[in-house]
Amino acid sequence: MTKQLILENVSFRYGKTGPWIVDHVSCEVHSGDFIGIIGPNGGGKTTLTQLMLGLLQPVCGKIFTCFTQENRPLSIGWVPQHFAYDAAFPITVKETVLSGRLATLPWYGRYTKKDHDAAEEALHTVDLLEYKDSCFSHLSGGQIQRVLLARALSARPKFLLLDEPTANIDPSNQQKILQILSDLNKHCTILMITHDLHHTAGCFNRVFFMNKKLTALADTTTISERFCCNTFGKCS
């Protein structure tokens, strides 16, 4: 299998004397992987994904990717946990999804038919095409997460990074998102941060525990025990 992403002893902190947020992390992500990263709040999970995206640069260590700097914005899709928007601004669902195509726009900045087709295809994938003309701010929390997934999919990425996509949403939308991701994994590599072990552990072919350092875990029992031990300080 193709190695799409390689991290070699990657470390990151803010400033010269700040605490290490990511501490000597090494891992490989192969094409077709569905990787879960779990761990306590403040464990560096989101920072690690920002390093993978190139939004932050490691203080030491190296990150290698099979995607060039030019095509990385299209090849790697990013679904954040939080999306800042002004509820008073009447942006539609389709306009929100189209914003995921910004990196494809020519210098004059107009969306083409190809962009509109890609946006509608992405909305169809997340089963929200009928809402394309609805106001984004009027959607439920679960629907908003599916729109953000569609926004990432509109660029037709080969690699998808998600930060807590099933957090704080209703069970129905949780299941829809997980089913969509399972279907996408047939042709897209996925790396997902999650706290929801009960619903998501069975989706992954590989799982890592992240608390400054990254540890590969073998099975769901190991996952649960390690998570409880590090999060609550109580090991069975």
Curated annotation (Swiss-Prot):
It is found in: Cell inner membrane. It is a peripheral membrane protein. GO terms for molecular function: ATP binding; ATP hydrolysis activity. Keywords: ATP-binding, Cell inner membrane, Cell membrane, Membrane, Nucleotide-binding, Transport. The keyword ATP-binding applies. InterPro entries: AAA+_ATPase, ABC_transporter-like_ATP-bd, ABC_transporter-like_CS, Metal_Ion_Import_ABC, P-loop_NTPase. Residues 5-236 form the ABC transporter domain. One of its GO terms (cellular component) is plasma membrane. Its main location: membrane. Pfam families: ABC_tran. ATP binds at residues 39-46. Belongs to the ABC transporter superfamily. Part of an ATP-driven transport system TC_0696/TC_0697/TC_0698 for a metal. Probably responsible for energy coupling to the transport system. This is Probable metal transport system ATP-binding protein TC_0697. The lineage of its organism: Bacteria, Pseudomonadati, Chlamydiota, Chlamydiia, Chlamydiales.
